[in-house]
């Protein structure tokens, strides 16, 4: 009897101690409303108070779409209006709770001030970048126009030399060789009417090659002797140059000297 009494006392003491301890309270939840952008449905969501400053994932019961909701941003009215979640922010301050959520969270003002301080430099930087872009837009357009103008300018002088060249070709005086060949062909045909033009041209070319004084501008009276040429008519006739040949050679030499000095002979 003496040994069993303390045991019963201890059991009774434990049972009384368990009865005195209150049952664990369920975690308090806040009823919030989330708008589903996919099916345009308002969802009633119970968010634990410990997760009010976190980003939670909500599954829509109507379309099974997953929504990522930032509860920290919804606490600010400005963030709630920008995120189109104003009903959710109003639900946090709804009269269902005995007192507002802002009263339950005394450290709420600190995040708000930090977020406003962080937002103001971002806004100022965005406005400054927009203004700088607006100021630089006319400068870039003017620079591009100047570059296009400089690219088009070099194309104009390219066409000018070609026009000058064509005019020079049109105004060019026949060379001494051409004048000599022309006069020589006429002389050979006059002396031998039966000769062909091809044979006369060949004979004129040989005459030009056999008289170097024509190339160097020498006059025929400087000790050169008369030579004969053989025509290409197959008869093997030998023709001697007359005074007209020397006159033509002298005229060709004079034309060559005048053209080298830049003076038109005729």
UniProtKB/Swiss-Prot annotation:
Q: Which organism is it from?
A: Oryza sativa subsp. japonica (Rice)
Q: What family is this protein classified in?
A: Belongs to the YABBY family.
The GO annotation for biological process reads: abaxial cell fate specification; cell fate commitment; fruit development; polarity specification of adaxial/abaxial axis; regulation of leaf development; regulation of shoot apical meristem development
Zn-finger region bounds: C4-type: 36-63
What residue range is the signal peptide? none
Instruction: Mark out the compositionally biased spans (Polar residues).
Output: 142-165
Cite the record's tissue specificity text: Expressed in leaf primordia, young leaves, floret meristems, floral organ primordia, stamens and carpels. Does not show polar expression pattern.
Pfam families from the entry?
A: YABBY, YABBY_N
- State the UniProt keywords alphabetically: Differentiation, Metal-binding, Nucleus, Zinc, Zinc-finger
Spell out the protein name for this chain.
Answer: Protein YABBY 5
- Its function? May be involved in leaf cell growth and differentiation, rather than abaxial cell fate determination.
